[in-house]
Amino acid sequence: MIKKYKLMSILAISFSFITCGQKTDHQQLQSKTQLSKKQQTMDVSKITDPAVKQAIEALQAGDKRWYGFFTENPVMTDDGNTVDFKSFFSNALGKESFLSIDRVENNGQALYGKFNAGKWGTFPVFFKFHKNPEGKFDRLDIGQAR
């Protein structure tokens, strides 16, 4: 009888240690929500070009409105290499975002800041937006800021 009691006590304590170390679904969702709110509320007040500001707000939110700020087939470079805009952002939108905007140049169309690039890590970047005469972006140059 005492052996059964000891065994049951050991099992109960073991299970309590296991369950205490796990996050509940609610805790995991809360963590993700806090990160999402942080991304969406990053300070964009330094961005002086209204279209760039709105585009960055869409990027931060992982919102497909991002695509609407660009022409049908914008030119895009990543560290000087031409890449397909739609393909690039089909993988990045909602997974990558600015952590801070540190510097703005070229009438609000060139941004420099800290960027979380998902699996690639966090590093300083630039985003340079180029507008066509109709006000849509027809080119985006991004890359690591030096």
Task: Please place each PLM-identified region on the residue numbering.
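Bacterial Sec-dependent N-terminal signal peptides
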Residues: 1-31
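Short, low-complexity N-terminal intrinsically disordered segments enriched in polar/charged residues
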Residues: 20-61
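Short, well-ordered alpha-helical segments enriched in acidic and aromatic residues
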Residues: 51, 61-77
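Acidic surface patches and DE-rich sequence motifs
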Residues: 70-71, 78, 117, 132
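Mature extracytoplasmic domains of secretory-pathway proteins
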Residues: 72-79, 84, 94-95
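Hydrophobic/anchoring residues in structured secondary elements
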Residues: 76, 103-106, 142
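Surface-exposed, charged secondary-structure patches
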Residues: 86-130
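Short beta-strand edge/turn micro-motifs at domain boundaries
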Residues: 122-146
